[in-house]
Design a protein with these regions (language model features):
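Conserved alpha-helix/loop element of class I SAM-dependent methyltransferases that forms part
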Residues: 5-27, 36, 294-295
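Conserved beta-strand positions in the Rossmann-like core of class I SAM-dependent methyltransferases
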Residues: 29, 50
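Conserved SAM-binding loop of SAM-dependent methyltransferases across substrates and taxa
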Residues: 34-46
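Class I S-adenosyl-L-methionine-dependent methyltransferase module
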Residues: 57-249
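A short SAM/SAH-binding and catalytic strip from SAM-dependent methyltransferases
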Residues: 99-104, 277-292
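A short glycine-rich, Lys/Arg-flanked "PGG" loop and its adjoining helix->strand segment in the class I
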Residues: 293-307
Length: 307
């Protein structure tokens, strides 16, 4: 299977939803993607979440993560999923426990694609494989020592200074233009449908976000930075809440309020009856939809939102 699923990790930061939405005790409809947003929110808050995705394999990935946190300790789940350093023997052993939590069709899928399990499921999506390849080139170019020094910085101010002195180089901009050219990125890194509204240089846009990626949040708390540049999360404090020991008890208590469904948000909203939501997290679905379709969805959401 060339691309079993597009995203191993949600590209949306759950902190955005947590800060922007009045979520405690509410009902949220969101895009499932890699599962980090709904799983992290349910680990910290008592609420109801319905997470939907047009891809059945994204849903299978999310249910695998649910099975992992229900049957393993947090540090074991992190290793099993691929956040921690590679350990194929441990992952195979852990999968024997996780398998008992999976629906029959999901179990058959993962057994057919067992190499995804042994290699770590989060790093074997279309997007992650592409970006991790690019990041390995980047780290080889600037030196792993510099990345480790930055990851160990104690403040964002130090990260700013270090980035401008040691990492900001003209060749990096050229690399971004190549790696994120629509012809290459739209085939290997992302489904081309997600670029239908793209205007201007995608590589330049990514480059402008590049410095923020390194300097806008404390590196020790940024699991995206650590995972993409080093291939694993270095500091446990950076792991998503659903993989942290501090939230494990509340996660197990609240997870009954979380469901995953293979369905589009458009279809879910269209067929709402008595069930209404207090909050919606739509991710970047507008990138994949025509304007008229998105306008129709937003109009329907406004009419059917519980206030």
């Amino acid at each position: 299977m060339k691309h079993p699923y597009d995203f191993g990790i949600s590209q949306d930061d759950f902190l955005v939803e947590e800060k922007a939405l009045p979520i405690n005790g509410g009902k949220l409809l969101c895009v499932a993607s890699g599962g980090e947003v709904p799983l992290s929110l349910i680990a910290k808050h008592t609420m109801n979440i319905d997470a939907v995705d047009v891809s059945i394999n994204q849903i299978r990935l999310c249910r695998l993560k649910v099975g992992a946190v229900q049957s393993l300790e947090p540090h074991e789940s992190a290793t099993f999923l691929g956040f921690s350093k590679k350990n194929e023997v441990c992952r195979t052993t852990y999968f024997e426990k996780v398998a008992k939590m999976l629906p029959k069709d999901d179990l058959e899928f993962w057994n057919r694609n067992i190499s995804l399990i042994t290699k770590g499921v989060i790093g074997n999506s279309r997007f992650e494989k592409y970006l991790l390849f690019f990041c390995r080139l980047f780290v080889s170019y600037i030196g792993k020592r510099k990345v480790l020094e930055l990851v160990n910085m104690e403040s964002v101010e130090s990260q700013h200074v270090y980035f401008d002195k040691h990492i900001k180089k003209s060749l990096i901009k050229w690399i971004f233009r190549v790696v994120f050219s629509p012809a290459l990125y739209g085939n290997r890194g992302l489904n081309a449908q997600g670029l239908i509204h793209q205007r201007g240089s995608l590589g330049t846009q990514f480059y402008l976000k590049f410095r923020d990626f390194f300097t806008s949040t404390p590196a020790k708390n940024n699991f995206y930075l650590q995972f993409y540049l080093l291939g694993h999360v270095v500091f446990e404090q950076a792991l998503p809440p659903y993989l942290q020991q501090d939230f494990h008890e509340s996660l197990l208590k609240n997870i009954k309020g979380l469901s995953f469904e293979n369905r589009t948000i458009q279809d879910k909203v269209k067929h709402l009856d008595s069930l209404r939501y207090t909050n919606y997290a739509l991710s970047n679905i507008s990138d994949w939809m025509e304007k008229e379709e998105m306008d129709s969805l937003l109009t329907t959401i406004v009419k059917r939102t519980e206030v």
